[in-house]
Amino acid sequence: MAGNTIGQLFRVTTFGESHGIALGCIVDGVPPNLELSEKDIQPDLDRRKPGTSRYTTPRREDDEVQILSGVFEGKTTGTSIGMIIKNGDQRSQDYGDIKDRFRPGHADFTYQQKYGIRDYRGGGRSSARETAMRVAAGAIAKKYLREHFGIEVRGFLSQIGNIKIAPQKVGQIDWEKVNSNPFFCPDESAVEKFDELIRELKKEGDSIGAKLTVIAENVPVGLGEPVFDRLDADLAHALMGINAVKGVEIGDGFAVVKQRGSEHRDEMTPNGFESNHAGGILGGISSGQPIIATIALKPTSSITIPGRSINLNGKPVEVVTKGRHDPCVGIRAVPIAEAMVAIVLLDHLLRFKAQCK
C-alpha cells in the first residue's frame, strides 16, 4: 500500500488501523525553531475526536497525542516529527459478523479484492479513525502558517441533508459561534434544525450526507505549480482523500455551470478584486484572495437498517451494522478538512520560497 504520504517538501505519512494498538504519523519538512508541544495539537484533535456530543459516535477515545521525535526543548529541530495516538475504546467483537461478509457502501469488498486480506475490525485502515493523525499533522501546519505568514485556515458546516445555512460572507463569519456548537455552524437557526434532523435519524437508524466549507485567509499571491501541481488540483487531491468525500468545489464550484462569463470573471480595480467567484485561485496559482473550498460527504453506510450484500463466497447475505457510528460524518470532518487544506498550503509555501524568493 503506497498511498500513505502526501506533500513534497512538507510531507505527512500516516499509519495505523481503527482497532490497532495505535495510530501514528511522520511529518517531514517542518522548519526548525517552531515552538511546539502536544498542547498546540490537542485542541484540534479534541474537535475531531469521537464521543464528544450526542450527535456523533458514542465510541470514546481520549485521542491524546504524544510527540516522539523532532522537538527538543520545546522547539522543532528540522528533523522528522513522529507522533502517535493510542487506541483505547475498541469493541472488535462488534465486527465478528462481517468477518466473512461485505458491508454495502464500504471499502470491505475493494480491500479484499485488491489485497486478498483485510482487517475487518472497524474497517481497519479504511476507517475514518486514521484521520486523527492528519489532524495532528495539520495542527502543526496551521500553527506555522498562522505564526509565520498570518494565514488562518478555518471551516464550518454549511449543509446537512436539505438543510442549508444562511449565506456567509468571508470576513464577517463569527468564528467564535462556529466553535461554540457541536455542528461547527455559524447559523444559530440552522443548528436547531440540524439537531432535530440528527435526533430523527438516530431513532430511524439511518444517516445523512453533509457539505462543509474551508476558508484560508491572508494567503499570498503565487502559491501553486502549473501545470500538474496547480494549487486547486492539490487541494482537490487532498480533500478527496478524506473518507466519505464525494465532491470538491473551489470557489463557486459547480454553480459556474449556470453563470455567464460577464458574471463569473473576477474583475479588478486598483483597489483589488471586485468578487471572488474563483475561490482565490487563478490559473492554478493563488491570487491573494481568500481561498474557499467546499466538500460534499456521503451518508455513512454504517446504519442499523438491514442491507443486501454478498459474502466471501459470493453468496447473498443480509448485513446489519453493529458497532458505534456517526449519523452524519460531516460533523467531525470540519477539523479534518482544515488540516488537509493547511498541509497543502504549507507545502506550497515552502516550494514557493525555494523557487521564487
From Swiss-Prot:
Record field: compositional bias (Basic and acidic residues): 38-49
NCBIfam families for the chain: aroC, PRK05382.1
InterPro entries found in the cross-reference section: Chorismate_synth (IPR000453), Chorismate_synth_AroC_sf (IPR035904), Chorismate_synthase_CS (IPR020541)
Subunit structure: Homotetramer.
Residues that, per the record, bind FMN: 125-127, 243-244, 283, 298-302, 324
Gene designation per UniProt: aroC
Record-listed NADP(+) binding positions: 48, 54
Keyword entries, A-Z: Amino-acid biosynthesis, Aromatic amino acid biosynthesis, FAD, Flavoprotein, FMN, Lyase, NADP
Function recorded in the entry: This reaction introduces a second double bond into the aromatic ring system.
GO cellular component, one term: cytosol
Chain residue ranges for the region called Disordered: 38-60
Reaction(s) catalysed (UniProt annotation): 5-O-(1-carboxyvinyl)-3-phosphoshikimate = chorismate + phosphate
EC number of this enzyme: 4.2.3.5
One Pfam family recorded for the sequence: Chorismate_synt
Cofactor needs: FMNH2
PROSITE patterns in the record: CHORISMATE_SYNTHASE_1, CHORISMATE_SYNTHASE_2, CHORISMATE_SYNTHASE_3
GO molecular function: chorismate synthase activity; FMN binding
One BP term from GO: aromatic amino acid family biosynthetic process
Protein name: Chorismate synthase
Note describing how the cofactor binds: Reduced FMN (FMNH(2)).
Name of the top EC class for this enzyme: lyase
Family the UniProt entry places it in: Belongs to the chorismate synthase family.
Pathway the protein contributes to: Metabolic intermediate biosynthesis; chorismate biosynthesis; chorismate from D-erythrose 4-phosphate and phosphoenolpyruvate: step 7/7
Keyword match Lyase: yes
